[in-house]
Amino acid sequence: MNFLSPPPFLPETTGPEADARYKRLRAQVFTGAFIGYAAYYLVRKNFAMAIPMLSQFGIDKSELGIALGMNAVAYALRKFLMGSVSDRSDARKFLPLGLVLCSIAMACMAVPVTWLDLAHHPERKMLAIGIMAGLNFLVGWFGGMGWPPCGRVMTHWFSQNERGTMMSIWNCAH
């Protein structure tokens, strides 16, 4: 995964121009992390909004609990495991890559209902739930790629004295 390698270190610069550039870049980094993580939430939470509509195909909430549970398991595993990968990656590429993959997996969630034609073939319901569980696992897996790069850039771009304030503002992205 060479394309995810972090960029090379730049030589240190000083002076008023460097200070102005540093402040501007910090604002850009914070804004990118905030919007990026908010986008992860918008993508990941779509399935919950579709649950009431799935009842017309004979799928009830308890059956969909399997799919939702897979998301939680994958999200927890990925969040834990991807921290070490994220630490050795370029956050500018890692964060959007996860968001794109998460979005693709979520967009595919409509496939089981339409492709299996549950309206006319209710006997395919369990297969559809299984496919949704697998896709929701992928949504959780790729969705776990959001926090590690955000946490890392916050610690790199903000001092210990600023971090509490910036992280509490950033947490509004949830």
Task: Locate predicted features.
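Cytosolic juxtamembrane N-terminal segment immediately preceding the first transmembrane helix
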Residues: 2-35, 39-42
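Helical-face signature of the major facilitator-like transporter fold
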Residues: 33-37, 41, 72, 132-140
